[in-house]
Regions:
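Vicinal oxygen chelate
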Residues: 1-4, 89-124
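Short secondary-structure boundary/capping segments
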Residues: 3, 41-42, 64-67
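Core segments of cupin and vicinal oxygen chelate
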Residues: 14-57
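Short, conserved charged micro-motifs
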Residues: 20, 82-87
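Hydrophobic pocket/interface hotspot
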Residues: 21, 25, 75, 92
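Short beta-strand micro-motifs in enzyme catalytic cores
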Residues: 41, 73, 109-113
Length: 124
């Protein structure tokens, strides 16, 4: 059965430090803060809802993202104008966010920046 889809509606992310994740998405990336609740923050990423949830009581305090486990590999967010990527790179550099600078995918010609959130998960 086929069904119609639209762009990503929302994503939920468990984070190790809710305040740090909120600063990253709101202050560093410039996304809108929609709402705060006990243990959660809701972000508007240009029309896509990002629900950030702080660590559960059962989460080991030393738990960290491991790129070699089964996991979400990365999340790619669309940008309206590829010309804005250089400004985003400068913004990430100023905030000392690890990134690979502006790159171009050899197969598709897509231009992007890979950068990492405070938990080490890749974003494009």
């Amino acid at each position: 059965m086929q069904f119609g889809t639209s762009p990503l509606a929302h994503m939920g992310l468990w984070v190790t430090d809710l305040a740090q994740a909120k600063r990253f998405y709101v202050d560093t990336l410039g996304f809108g803060l929609l709402r705060r609740m006990q243990g959660a923050v809701f972000i508007d990423a240009q029309g896509t809802l990002i629900a950030l949830t702080g660590p559960a009581e059962q989460t080991d305090a030393a738990d960290r993202f491991d790129p070699f486990r089964v996991r979400l590999d990365h999340l790619a967010l669309a940008i309206v104008d590829a010309g804005e990527l250089a400004g985003l790179r400068d913004q990430l550099d100023a905030a000392e966010v690890p990134n690979h600078g502006v790159e171009q995918e050899p197969g598709t010609g897509a231009t992007y920046i890979t950068f990492y959130d405070p938990d080490g998960i890749a974003r494009e």
